[in-house]
Amino acid sequence: MIIAIDGPAASGKGTLGKRLAAHYHFRHLDTGVIYRAVAKALLDAGADPADEARAIAAALELDPERFGHPALKARAIGEAASVVSTFPKVREALLTFQRQFAAEPPGAVLDGRDIGTVICPNADVKIFVEADPVVRARRRTLEARARGEEVDEAVVLADILKRDERDRNRPVAPLKAAADAHVLDNSNLDIEAGLKAAIAIVESVRVRSGRA
């Protein structure tokens, strides 16, 4: 079974994906980490994230061992990843890796921005996570401060709105809910409530498909 979770920055899709994968004993891939790893490789090399040729090269040489690096959570890396992800050839280079991951039995949960529309259009379950931008900015600010980063919530909100605009309007694989996705608004849901709602969605699909 493949579960696709999409949504904008700081919507809670990553936490939901991780918890949902643990519940079903499936593998989990936060696809945003892939782009962050590419962005970090560029920044470490002193390259500009807007340098498309360098970004493509970094994507082709991507080392999965870099996925767990704590620095990938930094706001600067996230901003650079948002730029890198707009390049069609970068997305193409990372497509095969993501699809191979999704195909591994017994199942996988992938979260990102184009899982249900591009990476796994035939996923068994598609969930699109939404949340109010102000709520998302607050969550992202608290996460950053918990890591010891000094951040201004107003600046974080501005960054989120800018990323939303970039993600929704990029020419390749724009952020949008798949036509058959279940929309989950977790603006007012805590982690447990969000997980419970997602499990209910998955179980309803399993019942309809005769997998329950």
Swiss-Prot record:
UniProt GO MF annotations: ATP binding; CMP kinase activity; dCMP kinase activity
Catalytic activity, EC: 2.7.4.25
Name assigned to this protein: Cytidylate kinase
Family: Belongs to the cytidylate kinase family. Type 1 subfamily.
Keywords noted in UniProt: ATP-binding, Cytoplasm, Kinase, Nucleotide-binding, Transferase
Gene Ontology biological process terms in this record: pyrimidine nucleotide metabolic process
Primary enzyme class: transferase
Reaction catalyzed: CMP + ATP = CDP + ADP; dCMP + ATP = dCDP + ADP
InterPro entries assigned: Cytidylate_kin, Cytidylate_kinase_dom, P-loop_NTPase
UniProt-annotated location(s): Cytoplasm
CDD domains tied to this protein: CMPK (cd02020)
Annotated ATP binding sites: 7-15
Gene name of the encoded protein: cmk
Pfam families (alphabetical): Cytidylate_kin
The organism of origin for this protein: Nitrobacter winogradskyi (strain ATCC 25391 / DSM 10237 / CIP 104748 / NCIMB 11846 / Nb-255)
